[in-house]
Regions:
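Outer-membrane beta-barrel "beta-signal"
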Residues: 169, 197-211
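Transmembrane beta-strands of outer-membrane beta-barrel pores
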Residues: 35-41, 79-85, 125-127, 141-147, ...
Length: 211
């Protein structure tokens, strides 16, 4: 249900983009890079069954949709690469009724490196707080490919969902960005298993204005 809501939200956003395009030309006004470091076991999430940590590298293209009196609205296109590490901590998570359960326990209890390649579209709300400092709230949804299976998620096609809250500091023709982020990775029950991963962490970004 949560993914359906996100899909509808992004559909509305793209409809708005199409309408805006009829009235004026929309083009990129900023490009940026963003680094995020997040993990499963933290202040918000804790699961004794597994450990999951990830470093995320994003390239960002910012499209201004609306400039309002209170809030500005932007769409961000974000191709990205995620380098994660996963380990099963509680072997009882794999129950004896599963086929080859002993083999699977031995396989997933080993620490493994996982790669995730994804393309994400995000809706950003931005509000100026004081001169050159703005608050940003961003909601993103994307699709990608994850390189290895685990007891929680199948290898292959997957969805990513991200929410971030942070501050941007403008300096001349560039700006720095610092935020907290919450994310989820799963595959919408296209494959089994689909327990997914939850993460919480921090983001650091740098952007350059090109308009």
């Amino acid at each position: 249900m949560n993914k359906l809501i996100l899909f509808l939200l992004l559909f509305i956003c793209f409809s708005a983009i199409g309408q805006e395009n009829k009235e004026r030309q929309i083009s990129v006004n900023k490009v940026g890079i963003l680094f995020s470091k997040a993990k499963q076991n933290n202040l918000l999430f804790f699961d004794k069954d597994y450990d999951y940590k990830t470093n995320v590298y994003k390239f960002q293209l910012f499209y201004p949709i609306q400039k309002g009196e209170s809030w500005d609205v932007n769409i961000i296109l974000q191709p990205q690469f995620q380098k994660a590490q996963h380990q099963l901590l509680n072997e009882q998570f794999i129950t004896p009724d599963e086929e080859n359960f002993e083999f699977l326990r031995e396989k997933f209890i080993q620490k493994k490196d996982i790669s995730l390649y994804a393309f994400e579209v995000a809706l950003q709300l931005r509000k100026s707080i004081i001169k050159n400092i703005s608050f940003e709230a961003t909601l993103g949804l994307g699709a990608g490919y994850i390189s290895l299976e685990s007891e929680r998620l199948a290898k292959g096609f997957t969805f990513i969902e991200n929410v971030s809250l942070g501050l941007a500091h403008k300096i001349n023709k560039s700006e720095f960005f610092l935020a907290t982020t919450v994310g989820h990775v799963s595959n919408f029950n296209i494959q089994k298993p689909n327990s997914g991963y939850n993460i919480f962490g921090f983001e650091l970004g740098y952007r350059i204005f090109i308009k």
